[in-house]
Amino acid sequence: MTGIRCFVAVDLPGEMRDAIGRLQSRIATEGLRLVQLELVHVTIKFLGDVPETKVKRVTDALSKVTIAPFPAHVASMGTFPGRGDIRVVWLGLEGNFEELSQLVESALSVVGFEREVRGFSPHVTLGRVGRPGPETSRELHSKITSLNDVDLGCFTVDRFYLKKSTLTRGGPIYEDLAEFAL
């Protein structure tokens, strides 16, 4: 069955994206594909292909999520996997993302989505390594270690989105399907 490839996310304000762009330039390494700044976000839940007939029910369910706006900030920088050849470089975030995630999971379970069994780890993907290898991993580990205490400032999470993701050869294209104020 095909449908609309969807996910729930928090967008970052412009000044945070600018700071992330400066950070990306400091970790740029051959083999690391940096995420375009306009695509940077915090994924709360990936839904996969949602039948068009179900999108309204998803939107209605998400509109019932109630949580106060909350402050957030970058708390760490790391990689997936944590050991061995790096595949993803990310920024870890602190804030009330865990509660938002749980509320989104609860709301979507009512309309038939399975709850995520893995623990939620709020993060922003900075880049992906196309062909992981020891040389690229060593260089990235060195750069990340030197930037470990980076402070990108704080921002307020006051809304989240249901987004459509269209995969193209040039990379994904995201479109907001619905916005939910906190």
Map each language-model feature to its residues.
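Histidine-dependent nucleotide/RNA phosphoesterase domain, centered on the 2H-phosphoesterase fold
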Residues: 1-182
